[in-house]
C-alpha cells in the first residue's frame, strides 16, 4: 500500500535521506511491474529431501534471489567474481542472500478480489464511494446476490440487488443481454470503475447544502470526506479491488528446519498456500467450463482465503492452524503490543547491554556506580580489543578474544584505562519517568552484583530485595557526551514533575541525621553542673573527640571521663558562631561542619521534610556542584551516626495509652445510643451505620494522638526509638504507629465499604482470630488492587505520552497577550496550595504591584517569577495573578519557553527542543503507578476524612454570605441553600451590611472562609464576634435534610402509597417508615405547606426526591426549621486512589460521568414548572432580560437548589459530577481548562502527590486542539468535521484573502485516545491504536507524513526532532565551512582512536 518512486528513491530510503513519507493505494500495475520480481504459480515451499526452495514456489530463488551469498541454485556460479550474472541454467542472479529480505513477488488472481480493509473497516470506504450499505456489499462480495451494473433499457436500477430467483425472473423477462448484473469482486470492480467521482462530489456538496437534518448532514459530510480524499489524491477507487496480490519477501516469513525433520514456519506461508491452491483450482475449473454453482463457490473461497491473508478473523471464523490456534495474518503482524510497530520499531533490543541484581554501594560517590569486572569485560570488549591491537599486544581480533577469555593481566589494565571517563547508563524497569535511566561513571568491583548509590534509589524506585537493573554502554562520542552532560546522576537531583529534590537521604541516613540534630535532652543544670560555653565550633569538636561521643546517658550512667572534658551529643551547650552566642547541642555543631557556610548555622531538628528543604535551598544558593558534595556528606554522616546511635526498637517501646479502656467504654456507650435511636425509628439503618463509623473514627484519632504524645515523652534523657523513626520520617507513619500501640481501627471490605465494628486490639496486645480474619480482608484487597491497577496506570501513561509526544519547546517567546488567572487553592478555611507555589517559575502577563502602592512593582510583565518574587506576591496578600500558560500559547507548533516557564528539573528557563509533552505525561502517569502500588501499605485500614463541626481558628466577626437561613425552635440558624459560606473577618468596627458589601466585591479578605452544607446548624448569629477555638457550626454528615422555612400545616401532594411512596417496616425496630420510591408515573412527590388547617392559602412547596424518608405526617402543624424529610447520604466509602485513577482517566478521556449533574445555562433565579414525562421541569429565569432556560431533571436526582435561589451560569443544580463537554458549551474554554486542571489536581492532592499545574495544562491543551465546523462558508472544510485550530485559521485566512466567506466553528473537547488517533502523523496514530483503520484512512486520501513528531522519526530510524536532535541544534552544522568540517572529522577520528 506504500507508494514508491524510482530505484533512486529506494537508495535514498536506505540511506535514510528522506523527510516525508506518503502512503497510497497500490494499483495492479504497481504491484505487478514495480514491486514484483516474478509470479508465484505453485504453493510448494522447499524440497523435503534437499531442503532447497522449489522453483516457482513461495521460496523460489529465481524470483527472490539466492539463499547463499554469491551462489546460484544449481551451483554453476560461485564466488563474488560472478556478481550480477544471471545463471543460464537455473535463472538465479548471483548476488547477496540478503536481497531475499527485499524482493517481492505476486500472485495473479483468477478473479478480482475485494481488499477486506476497504470493505470491512468502519466506515466502509467502498460502501461510502458506491453509496451502498456494508451488508448489501457483503452479499455481493461473497456471491450471495447479484448487483445491477448496467440496467440497460429494463426497469431495473443501477446497484439494485437481485437474489437468484429474482435474477432468473429478470433474465426470463428481459433476456440475458438486456442488462448487466454480476456478483463478487468483479461486480464491485466494475461499479467502482464506472463511478464518476467529480460529479458525485458535486452532488454530495449540493445535498449537504440543502439538507437541514443534523444527522443526515453528519452522514453526508462523512461520505463527502472519503470521496474528496479520492478526488484530491491520485488514487482510483477500483484499486481497492485486487487483481494481483503482492507476496512478502521470503526472509520475512521464514521456514526453519528443526531437529527431527520438522519445520517451524511463519503463519503467512500457510495463508499464502491456501490462496495459491484455491487460485490454481479456480483457474483449472474456469478452463473446464464447470457449472456456475461450483465456480461461484470456488470464487467465494478464494475471496475468503485472501481475506484471511490480510486480516484473519475479520470476516467469519478465523482460519486455524496446528493446535487450533488462529493464524497470524498481515494485519496481526502490525497490530498490538507484539506487532511490527510496537515490538520492532518503537522498542528494540540493544547490544552492549547487561543486567544484574543490585546491591547498595554506600562507599560510592554520587556520580558513580559499581560495575562487576566480568560484566565490564564483556560490555567493553570492542574497546579493549582496539586498545590491545593499538598497543601491539595482539595482532588479530581472534587472538585478542582469546586473551580476554584467559583474563590476562594486561586486559585488566586496559579495562581500567578504558572505563575512565566512559559513562554507562543504568536503567530499572519499569521506567516510569525520565529519572528511570541515568548515567554513572563505572567503578570496577569484585562480585556479580551492580552497586548503586543509596541516594539515587528514590529516582529509580529501587530497593535491594532482589531488584535488577540493566546497564547500557553509549558507544559513539556524541552518545558519551550526551550521557556526561545531560544524564549524569548529579544532573538529576530534582523531580521534573514538581521541582522537589528526589535525591534526599532516607531510612538510616534520615534517622542518623535526625538523631544528631535532635533537641537537647541532657541539661547539665539538672545534673548539678552548668551549661558549657565554647568560643567556636572547633573547640566543640575537640571536646567531642577528647571524650568520645557519649551517645546514651543511661549506658554511661553518671560516670564522665576523668578529665571532665567528655560531652554528651545532646547536651545543651553555648557556642559563639559568627559573633553571636547560640544555645545548641554538640550534635548540631558537628552536623553544621558539612553544611555550606552560605546556608548559615542550622539550629533545629532535621526530619526528612526539612532535609529536603535544605537541599533545595542549598541548590538555589550555592549551585549544583556544592549541592552534590553536600548530598554525599549527608549520606556519609547519616549512615555513620545511625550506626553509632544503634537505635533499635523493643517491644516495650510500644506504649499503650492508659486512657484506652476509658475511651473504648465511652465509644461503646455512644454506639449503643445510636443503635437505640435506630430501634426507635428516629434514624435509618444507613444513618446508624454512618454515625457508628463517625464515632469509631473519632476514637481512632483520639487514641492515635494519645499514643503519639505518650511515646514523645523522653525517659532518662532518652528518646523513644519508635518516636525517632516516625518523627524523622525514616520509617513508618502515625497510622502504623496507631495500629501498633492503640487500636487497628476500622477496616474496609474488598468493595470499599467500611466494616462498622472496628478492631479494638493493637499489634502489641495481639489480635483475636476473628480480628485477624477481618484484617486479612482489607490486606488482600490492597494486594489485589496493586496487581490490577498497575496495568491500568501503565496504560494511562501510554495514552498520555501518545497524546503529548509532539509538544516540544519550539521558540523562546510566542508574544501572546492571553493569560490564565490562578489563585490560592483552599478547602473550606484550610489552605491546600498557597499562591506562591502555583506562580513560581511562571511568566507574568501583566505588572504586579504592591496592593495600594502602584510605585512598588513586585514583578514586571514578561518576568519569570523567582521563588523570592513568588513569596513577595504571596506575602503582599494578592488574591490572584495573571500568568501565561501552555493553554494560551500561540506557537504554531509545540509551545514557547515563556508560556511554559521554568524547567523544574534544574530551575532554569526551559530550553529549546525540550520534550515537555513527554515530561508532562510521565509526571502525571508515574505517581499513578506509585499510588496504585502503595495502596496496600494501609493494610485496608479505613481512611475516611470528615469533620462534623466547624471551629473558629482566630478572633473576628462572623459574616454570613449568600446564605439562606431559618431559625428553629431552639434558636439555632439552619442553612437552607448549598452555595453560601461563613466568613471570619477582622473586627474593624464596621456595620454588618458594610462587611457583606466589601466581601461580595472582594474588597477585603476574610481571615477564614467556611463553605457550609445544606442543613448545617450555625451556632453563632450573623455579625456576632467569635473567639479562637469557639464552635461556629455543626455539619450534618449523614443526611441531606429538607427543612421547612415557614410555619403552617402539612399536606402531601402526589405522595401516593404504592405508587410514589411505600411504607417499609424496619426489620429491627418494627417501626413503619414512609419512603419516596422511584416511579414511572406523572406524579411529582412534594410536601405543600398551607397557612391554615383548611388548606386554602398555600405558603410553600418542597419537592421530595426518591429515596427520602418523610419525617412529618399529613395535617401536622409545623414550625420553621422543622425537618420535613431526609435523604440518607449512603454508606461512606473509603477514599483511595482506586477511585482516583479511574477518575483521572475519566477526566482526560473526557467521558461523561455516571449520574452526571445538571448545570445552569444562564444566570438567574430558580423556579419549578411541574412535571413532564417523569421529569421535573426546572426553569432558570434571568430577572433583567426575562430570558428562560428549561432543564428536564429526572425525579431520581437530588436537587441542590430550591425555588427562589439565585444561580450563576455553570453552577450545579443537582448532585453529581459535571460533564466537561457541558462546561465547554456553557462557560467556554477557559472555565473548562480551569475545571479539568483542578479536578485532576484534586485526585493527586488527596494522595499527597505534588504535580505542577503546567504538566496537566499541556495534556488539557492537547485535548482542546480541535474545533468542530458548524458552517463551512466558502472554505473546503466540511460540516461537522473536526479540524486542527491551526488548519482552521489558515483555511479561513486563505478564504478571506480570496474574498470568500470564512467558516464558523466551535471548540471541541476530545479524550486523549481520540486526540492521539487524530494526530497529523498517520505513522504515529497507527502505532498507537486502531492500526488497520488508521492506515486504511491514510491510504485512501494519500496522506503525507512530514515526520515532525517523535514517534514517527523513531519508527523511520531518524534522529528525534527534540533535545540535541532539535532543528536549531542540527542547523549549526550548516554554518561550518568545508575545511572546518574536515577538521571536526579529523578530531573525531583522533578522539575515537584515543577512546578506543
UniProtKB/Swiss-Prot annotation:
One example GO MF annotation: DNA-directed RNA polymerase activity
Cite the cofactor comment: Binds 1 Mg(2+) ion per subunit. Binds 2 Zn(2+) ions per subunit.
Residues at which Mg(2+) binds: 463, 465, 467
- Any one GO cellular component localisation term in the record: DNA-directed RNA polymerase complex
- Residues annotated to bind Zn(2+) 2: 814, 889, 896, 899
What is one process in the GO biological process aspect for this record? DNA-templated transcription
The record's catalysed reaction(s) read:
RNA(n) + a ribonucleoside 5'-triphosphate = RNA(n+1) + diphosphate
Name the PANTHER family on file: DNA-DIRECTED RNA POLYMERASE, DNA-DIRECTED RNA POLYMERASE SUBUNIT BETA
UniProt-recorded name of the protein: DNA-directed RNA polymerase subunit beta'
Species, as recorded: Chlamydia trachomatis serovar L2b (strain UCH-1/proctitis)
Amino acid at each position: 500500500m506504500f507508494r514508491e518512486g524510482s530505484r533512486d528513491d529506494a537508495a535514498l530510503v536506505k540511506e535514510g535521506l528522506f523527510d516525508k513519507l506518503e502512503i497510497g493505494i497500490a494499483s495492479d500495475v504497481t504491484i505487478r511491474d514495480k514491486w514484483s520480481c516474478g509470479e508465484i504459480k505453485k504453493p510448494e515451499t522447499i524440497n523435503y529431501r534437499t531442503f532447497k526452495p522449489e522453483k516457482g514456489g513461495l521460496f523460489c530463488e529465481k524470483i527472490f534471489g539466492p539463499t547463499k551469498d554469491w551462489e546460484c541454485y544449481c551451483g554453476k556460479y560461485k564466488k563474488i567474481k560472478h556478481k550480477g550474472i544471471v545463471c543460464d541454467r537455473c535463472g538465479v542472479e548471483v548476488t547477496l542472500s540478503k536481497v531475499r529480505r527485499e524482493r517481492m513477488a505476486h500472485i495473479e488472481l483468477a478473479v478480482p478480489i475485494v481488499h477486506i480493509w476497504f470493505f470491512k473497516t468502519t466506515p466502509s470506504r467502498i460502501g461510502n464511494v458506491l453509496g451502498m450499505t456494508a451488508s448489501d456489499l457483503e452479499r455481493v462480495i461473497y456471491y450471495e446476490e447479484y448487483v445491477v451494473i448496467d440496467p440497460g433499457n429494463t426497469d431495473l436500477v443501477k446497484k439494485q440487488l437481485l437474489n437468484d430467483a429474482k435474477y432468473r425472473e429478470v433474465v426470463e423477462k428481459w433476456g440475458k443481454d438486456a442488462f448487466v448484473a454480476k456478483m463478487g469482486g468483479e461486480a464491485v470492480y466494475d461499479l467502482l470503475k464506472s463511478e464518476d467521482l467529480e460529479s458525485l462530489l458535486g452532488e454530495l456538496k449540493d445535498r449537504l447544502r440543502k439538507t437541514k437534518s443534523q444527522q443526515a448532514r453528519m452522514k453526508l459530510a462523512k461520505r463527502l470526506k472519503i470521496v474528496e480524499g479520492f478526488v484530491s489524491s491520485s488514487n482510483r477507487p477500483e484499486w481497492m479491488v485486487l487483481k494481483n496480490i503482492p507476496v512478502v519477501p521470503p526472509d520475512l516469513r521464514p521456514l526453519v528446519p528443526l531437529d527431527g525433520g520438522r519445520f517451524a514456519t511463519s503463519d503467512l506461508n500457510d495463508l499464502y498456500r491456501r490462496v495459491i491452491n484455491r487460485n490454481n483450482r479456480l483457474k483449472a475449473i474456469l478452463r473446464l467450463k464447470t457449472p456456475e454453482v461450483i465456480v461461484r463457490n470456488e470464487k467465494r473461497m478464494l475471496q475468503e482465503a485472501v481475506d484471511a491473508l490480510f486480516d484473519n478473523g475479520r470476516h467469519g471464523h478465523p482460519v486455524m492452524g496446528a493446535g487450533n490456534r488462529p493464524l497470524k495474518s498481515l494485519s496481526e503482524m502490525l497490530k498490538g503490543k507484539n506487532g511490527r510497530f510496537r515490538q520492532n520499531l518503537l522498542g528494540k533490543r540493544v547490544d552492549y547491554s547487561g543486567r544484574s541484581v543490585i546491591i547498595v554501594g554506600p562507599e560510592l560517590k554520587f556520580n558513580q556506580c559499581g560495575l562487576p569486572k566480568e560484566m565490564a569485560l564483556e560490555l567493553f570488549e570492542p574497546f579493549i580489543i582496539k586498545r590491545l591491537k593499538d598497543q601491539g599486544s595482539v595482532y588479530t581480533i581472534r587472538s585478542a578474544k582469546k586473551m580476554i577469555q584467559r583474563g590476562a593481566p594486561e586486559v585488566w589494565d586496559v579495562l581500567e584505562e578504558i572505563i575512565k571517563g566512559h559513562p554507562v547508563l543504568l536503567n530499572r524497569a519499569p521506567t516510569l519517568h525520565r529519572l528511570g535511566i541515568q548515567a554513572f561513571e563505572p567503578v570496577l568491583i569484585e562480585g556479580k552484583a551492580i552497586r548503586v548509590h543509596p541516594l539515587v534509589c528514590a529516582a529509580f524506585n529501587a530497593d535491594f530485595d532482589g531488584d535488577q537493573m540493566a546497564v547500557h554502554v553509549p558507544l559513539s562520542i556524541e552518545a558519551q557526551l550526551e550521557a556526561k552532560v545531560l544524564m549524569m546522576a548529579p544532573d538529576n537531583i530534582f523531580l521534573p514533575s514538581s521541582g522537589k529534590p528526589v535525591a534526599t537521604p532516607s531510612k538510616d541516613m534520615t534517622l542518623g541525621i535526625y538523631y544528631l540534630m535532635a533537641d537537647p535532652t541532657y541539661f547539665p543544670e539538672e545534673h548539678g553542673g552548668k551549661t558549657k560555653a565554647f568560643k567556636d565550633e572547633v573547640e566543640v569538636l575537640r571536646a567531642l573527640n577528647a571524650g568520645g561521643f557519649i551517645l546514651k546517658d543511661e549506658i554511661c550512667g553518671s560516670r564522665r571521663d576523668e578529665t571532665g572534658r567528655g560531652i554528651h551529643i545532646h547536651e545543651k551547650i553555648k557556642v559563639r558562631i559568627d559573633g553571636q552566642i547560640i544555645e545548641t547541642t554538640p550534635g548540631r555543631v558537628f552536623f553544621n561542619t558539612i553544611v555550606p557556610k552560605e546556608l548559615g548555622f542550622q539550629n533545629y531538628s532535621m526530619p526528612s521534610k526539612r532535609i529536603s528543604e535544605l537541599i533545595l535551598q542549598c541548590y538555589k544558593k550555592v549551585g549544583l556542584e556544592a549541592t552534590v558534595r553536600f548530598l554525599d556528606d549527608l549520606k556519609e554522616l547519616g549512615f555513620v551516626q545511625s550506626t553509632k546511635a544503634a537505635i533499635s526498637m523493643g517491644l516495650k517501646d510500644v506504649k499503650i495509652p492508659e486512657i484506652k479502656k476509658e475511651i473504648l467504654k465511652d465509644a461503646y456507650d455512644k454506639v449503643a445510643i445510636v443503635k437505640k435511636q435506630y430501634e426507635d425509628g428516629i434514624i435509618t439503618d444507613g444513618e446508624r451505620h454512618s454515625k457508628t463509623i463517625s464515632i469509631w473514627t473519632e476514637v481512632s484519632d483520639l487514641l492515635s494522638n494519645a499514643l503519639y504524645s505518650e511515646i514523645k515523652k523522653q525517659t532518662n534523657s532518652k528518646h523513644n526509638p519508635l518516636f525517632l523513626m516516625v518523627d524523622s520520617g525514616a520509617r513508618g507513619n502515625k497510622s502504623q504507629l496507631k495500629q501498633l500501640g492503640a487500636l487497628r481501627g476500622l477496616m474496609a471490605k474488598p468493595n470499599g465499604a467500611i466494616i462498622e465494628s472496628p478492631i479494638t486490639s493493637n499489634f502489641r496486645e495481639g489480635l483475636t482470630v476473628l480480628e485477624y480474619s477481618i484484617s486479612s480482608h482489607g490486606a488482600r484487597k490492597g494486594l489485589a488492587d496493586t496487581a490490577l491497577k498497575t496495568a491500568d496506570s501503565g496504560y494511562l501513561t501510554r495514552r498520555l505520552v501518545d497524546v503529548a509526544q509532539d509538544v516540544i519547546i519550539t521558540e523562546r517567546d510566542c508574544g501572546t497577550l492571553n493569560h490564565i488567572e490562578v489563585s490560592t487553592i483552599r478547602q473550606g478555611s484550610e489552605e491546600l496550595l498557597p499562591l506562591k507555589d502555583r506562580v513560581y517559575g511562571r511568566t507574568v502577563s501583566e505588572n504586579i504591584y504592591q496592593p495600594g502602592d502602584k510605585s512598588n512593582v513586585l514583578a514586571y510583565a514578561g518576568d519569570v517569577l523567582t521563588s523570592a518574587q513568588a513569596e513577595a506576591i504571596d506575602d503582599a496578600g494578592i488574591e490572584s495573578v495573571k500568568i501565561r500558560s501552555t493553554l494560551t500559547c500561540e506557537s504554531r507548533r509545540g509551545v514557547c519557553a515563556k508560556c511554559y516557564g521554568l524547567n523544574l528539573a534544574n530551575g532554569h528557563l526551559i530550553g529549546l527542543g525540550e520534550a515537555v509533552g513527554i515530561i508532562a505525561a510521565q509526571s502525571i502517569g508515574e505517581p499513578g503507578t506509585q499510588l496504585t502500588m502503595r495502596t496496600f501499605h494501609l493494610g485496608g485500614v479505613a481512611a475516611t476524612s470528615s469533620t462534623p463541626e466547624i471551629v473558629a481558628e482566630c478572633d473576628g466577626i462572623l459574616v454570613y454570605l449568600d446564605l439562606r437561613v431559618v431559625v428553629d425552635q431552639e434558636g439555632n440558624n439552619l442553612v437552607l441553600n448549598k452555595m453560601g459560606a461563613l466568613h471570619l473577618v477582622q473586627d474593624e468596627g464596621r456595620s454588618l451590611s458594610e462587611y457583606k458589601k466589601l466581601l461580595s466585591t472582594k474588597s477585603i479578605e476574610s481571615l477564614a472562609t467556611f463553605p457550609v452544607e445544606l442543613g448545617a446548624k450555625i451556632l453563632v448569629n450573623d455579625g456576632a464576634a467569635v473567639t479562637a477555638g469557639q464552635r461556629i457550626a455543626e455539619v450534618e454528615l449523614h443526611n441531606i435534610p429538607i427543612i421547612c422555612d415557614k410555619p403552617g400545616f402539612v399536606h402531601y401532594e402526589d405522595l401516593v402509597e404504592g405508587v410514589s411512596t411505600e411504607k417499609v417496616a424496619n426489620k429491627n425496630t418494627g417501626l413503619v417508615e414512609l419512603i419516596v420510591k422511584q416511579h414511572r408515573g406523572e406524579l411529582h412527590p412534594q410536601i405543600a405547606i398551607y397557612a391554615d388547617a383548611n388548606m386554602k392559602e398555600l405558603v410553600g412547596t418542597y419537592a421530595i426526591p426518591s429515596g427520602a424518608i418523610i419525617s412529618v405526617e399529613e395535617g401536622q402543624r409545623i414550625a420553621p426549621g422543622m425537618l420535613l424529610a431526609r435523604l440518607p447520604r449512603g454508606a461512606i466509602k473509603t477514599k483511595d486512589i482506586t477511585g482516583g485513577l479511574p477518575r483521572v482517566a475519566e477526566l482526560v478521556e473526557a467521558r461523561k460521568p455516571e449520574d452526571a449533574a445538571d448545570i445552569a445555562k444562564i444566570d438567574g433565579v430558580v423556579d419549578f414548572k411541574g412535571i413532564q414525562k417523569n421529569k421535573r421541569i426546572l426553569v432558570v429565569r434571568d430577572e433583567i432580560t426575562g430570558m428562560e432556560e428549561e432543564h428536564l431533571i429526572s425525579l431520581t436526582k437530588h436537587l441542590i437548589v430550591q425555588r427562589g435561589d439565585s444561580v450563576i451560569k455553570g453552577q450545579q443544580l443537582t448532585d453529581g459530577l459535571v460533564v466537561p463537554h457541558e462546561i465547554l458549551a456553557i462557560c467556554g474554554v477557559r472555565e473548562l481548562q480551569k475545571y479539568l486542571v483542578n479536578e485532576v489536581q484534586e485526585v493527586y492532592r488527596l494522595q499527597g502527590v505534588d504535580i505542577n499545574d503546567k504538566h496537566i495544562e499541556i495534556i488539557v491543551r492537547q485535548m482542546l486542539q480541535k474545533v468542530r465546523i458548524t458552517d463551512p462558508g466558502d472554505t473546503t472544510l466540511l460540516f461537522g468535521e473536526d479540524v486542527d485550530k491551526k488548519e482552521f485559521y489558515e483555511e479561513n485566512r486563505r478564504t478571506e484573502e480570496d474574498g470568500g466567506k470564512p467558516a464558523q466553528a466551535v471548540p471541541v473537547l476530545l479524550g486523549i485516545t481520540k486526540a492521539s488517533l487524530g494526530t497529523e502523523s498517520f505513522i504515529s496514530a497507527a502505532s498507537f491504536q486502531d492500526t488497520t483503520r488508521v492506515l486504511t484512512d491514510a491510504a485512501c486520501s494519500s496522506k503525507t507524513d512530514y515526520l515532525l513528531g517523535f514517534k514517527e522519526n523513531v519508527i523511520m530510524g531518524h534522529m528525534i526532532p527534540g533535545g540535541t536532535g532539535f532543528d536549531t541544534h542540527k542547523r549549526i552544522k550548516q554554518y561550518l565551512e568545508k575545511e572546518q568540517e574536515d577538521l571536526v572529522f579529523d578530531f573525531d577520528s583522533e578522539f575515537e582512536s584515543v577512546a578506543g
